[in-house]
Amino acid sequence: MEKLTILLLVAVVLMSTQALPQGGGEKRPRENIRFLSKRKSNAERWREGSCTSWLATCTDASQCCTGVCYKRAYCALWE
C-alpha cells in the first residue's frame, strides 16, 4: 500500500511538471494562476477596489477590506 501511494505521488509530480511547459510558451499573468487559493486576501480586494478602506462608510462587513463594519457606520480595523 505504501509503494502504491509513493507511486501515485511520483506520477502526480511528473504529470504536473509536464503540464507546465505545454502552456504554449506565453507568460501568463500572476492572477490567472490562482489554483491554490479560492478567496482573495484583504490586500488583493483593496488593490482591485472591490472593498472600502479603513474609516470609509459602510452598511455591511463585506464592504470593508478589514471585514469589520462598526455599528453599520464605518469600516474599522477591529471590533
Swiss-Prot record:
Q: Which UniProt keywords apply?
A: Disulfide bond, Knottin, Neurotoxin, Secreted, Signal, Toxin
Where in the cell? Secreted
Report residue numbers covered by any propeptide.
Answer: 20-47
On the tree of life, the source organism's domain of life is: Eukaryota
Does Lipid biosynthesis count among this protein's keywords? no
Q: In which tissues is it expressed?
A: Expressed by the venom duct.
List the disulfide bonds in this chain.
Answer: C51-C65, C58-C69, C64-C75
Q: What is this protein called?
A: Conotoxin TxMEKL-021
Q: Which organism is it from?
A: Conus textile (Cloth-of-gold cone)
